[in-house]
């Protein structure tokens, strides 16, 4: 009878977790937008459905997996903003439920599993709400580490088979932090396999890796994605930026030590228990607990380094509930006095930190630069188009006058709807193609003048992007280019001489450039 009640309780708790993790992300994703980030995969997914090819029809440095998966969601569920954010909500739900079952498998009290999972749902994808490559890749890396520790714990081959696939998908989402986590996981596996003589594991890992690579190569062939474009845009160009940023890292700086102090505090009990276990074990230092500890240590290092390199708002605080939970597991499994008090402290600490970051990143939407916005001023985005219905429109661009921004956008949509020539639009309002049901041939997902999205001057791949842009304009027979504020005309003129364009009159804060005969282009326009 008791066992049946526990099973019933577990099902109820899982149902609550499922609903909560979906709803909280869906709710906060509708709470204002930062156009450059909030719509990053919106138009791109629409363009893929309509035949555009990544690396060929738009410059791509990250997000390949998200783009195709979102295209699938649009194809199956419809093309609107609520379907778009449901994708992120589903990932939040998947990782939250997985966290619950991982903790339960490590024999943590079911109600603590429930509590820590809810905290995870609050700090997971919800801090962005909308699809974002750093969240997506980091959460997939966490899922890979879950597979690793379950393989170590259970010795089941299914986790070894899943591990390369998940890491591969994380890499196809964003090369960093997945590369850091890949090397971390590889180090742990090599140590474990050779120390424990689990050489059969190599077979499963190699077969799974080869199968995944073959599948991706076949998919690239099917999707007409050229490998040379993939290597240049997805690997070589981002690494040219990442090398410089890693070289500038100071591991003793305040950014690394103090900004992530709550992550370190949640990890300290796990560290101390592991040290005590190593001292006590003496000859059996490399037990499973040591490898669990090493897995989380290297994951923390990987994500902290990645977080600092991105130079974005913080997004890795979802580690805190996971680390608090595993610290509690380690404490319960070790002979320590007052272990219940330590467990209560971890629960209260996690509650405090989750509340703190929930208010800062979810309520204030700090990740998307909206911490100073009055959300009471927001307006239903269906005033722009019914496909954006449900989104409470307010942005950092027009923080005090969303109605004025909506009027501006409706004017732009009207102009683009009546444009009969082949047009290219350079804008961070990356929903215009889907809204007007017309490919606007944007050469990049987003426009950032710092050189992170595409090469700028002094980057060795500058000429490659220049040639890509000119080829795109020529191949698509573009006759007119619209540049919408806050994107600057320099995002075009740094690659193509302004003598190739004639400015035409249009609405305020929009540049309309007619393409003239020009030596830059292979054909007269």
Placement of each model-derived feature along the sequence:
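Membrane-interface transmembrane helices that cradle and orient dolichyl/undecaprenyl
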Residues: 104-107, 144-160, 170, 272-284, ...
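Specific aromatic-rich, kink-prone transmembrane helix
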Residues: 98, 137-154, 159-167, 186-190, ...
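Extracytoplasmic catalytic/substrate-binding loops of multi-pass membrane glycan-assembly enzymes
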Residues: 29-44, 55-72, 79-82, 223-227
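Short hydrophobic alpha-helices at membrane interfaces in multi-pass membrane enzymes
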Residues: 111, 147-169, 199-207, 286-297
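Extracytoplasmic
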Residues: 62, 177, 224, 351-523
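Membrane-interface alpha helices of multi-pass inner-membrane proteins
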Residues: 121, 159-177, 181-186, 297-308
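Short acidic/glycine- and proline-prone juxtamembrane loop motifs at membrane-interface regions
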Residues: 129-137
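Transmembrane-helix signature of polytopic, membrane-embedded enzymes
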Residues: 99-122
């Amino acid at each position: 009878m008791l066992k049946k009640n526990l099973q019933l309780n577990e099902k109820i708790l899982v149902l609550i977790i499922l609903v909560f993790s979906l709803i909280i992300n869906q709710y906060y994703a509708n709470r204002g937008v930062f156009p450059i980030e909030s719509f990053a995969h919106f138009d791109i997914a629409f363009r893929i459905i309509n035949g555009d090819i990544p690396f060929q029809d738009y410059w791509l440095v990250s997000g390949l997996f998200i783009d195709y998966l979102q295209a699938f969601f649009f194809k199956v569920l419809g093309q609107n903003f609520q379907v778009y954010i449901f994708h992120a909500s589903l990932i939040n739900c998947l990782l939250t439920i997985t966290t619950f079952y991982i903790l339960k498998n490590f024999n943590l009290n079911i109600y603590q599993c429930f509590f820590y999972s809810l905290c995870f749902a609050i700090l997971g994808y919800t801090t962005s709400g909308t699809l974002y490559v750093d969240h997506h890749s980091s959460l997939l890396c966490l899922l890979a580490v879950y597979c690793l520790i379950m393989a170590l714990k259970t010795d089941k081959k299914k986790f070894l088979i899943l591990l390369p696939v998940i890491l591969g998908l994380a890499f196809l989402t964003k090369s960093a932090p997945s590369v850091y986590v890949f090397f971390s996981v590889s180090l742990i596996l090599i140590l474990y396999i050779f120390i424990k003589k689990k050489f059969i594991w190599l077979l499963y890992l190699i077969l799974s890796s080869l199968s995944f690579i073959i599948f991706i190569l076949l998919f690239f062939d099917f999707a007409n994605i050229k490998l040379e474009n993939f290597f240049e845009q997805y690997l070589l160009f981002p690494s040219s930026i990442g090398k410089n940023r890693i070289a500038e890292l100071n591991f003793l700086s305040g950014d690394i030590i103090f900004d992530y102090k709550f992550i370190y505090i949640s990890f300290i009990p796990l560290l101390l228990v592991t040290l005590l276990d190593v001292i006590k074990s003496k000859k059996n230092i490399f037990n499973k607990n040591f490898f669990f500890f090493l897995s989380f240590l290297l994951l923390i290092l990987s994500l902290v380094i990645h977080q600092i390199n991105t130079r974005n708002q913080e997004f890795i605080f979802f580690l805190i509930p996971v680390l608090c939970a595993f610290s509690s597991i380690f404490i319960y499994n070790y002979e320590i006095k007052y272990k219940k008090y330590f467990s209560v402290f971890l629960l209260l600490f996690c509650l405090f930190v989750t509340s703190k970051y929930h208010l800062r990143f979810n309520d204030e939407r700090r990740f998307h630069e909206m911490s100073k916005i009055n959300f009471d001023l927001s307006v239903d985005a269906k005033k722009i188009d019914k496909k954006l219905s449900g989104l409470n429109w307010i942005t950092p661009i027009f923080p005090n006058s969303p109605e004025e921004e909506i009027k501006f956008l409706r004017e732009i949509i009207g102009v683009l709807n009546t444009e009969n020539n082949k047009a290219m639009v350079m804008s961070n309002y990356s929903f215009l193609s889907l809204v007007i049901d017309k490919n606007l041939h944007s050469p990049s997902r987003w426009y950032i003048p710092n050189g992170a999205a595409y090469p700028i001057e002094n980057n060795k791949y500058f000429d490659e992007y220049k040639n890509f842009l000119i080829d795109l304009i020529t191949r698509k027979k573009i006759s007119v280019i619209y540049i919408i504020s806050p994107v600057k005309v320099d995002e075009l003129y740094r690659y193509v001489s302004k003598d190739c364009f004639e400015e035409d009159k249009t609405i305020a804060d929009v540049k309309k450039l007619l393409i003239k005969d020009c030596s830059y282009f292979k054909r007269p326009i």
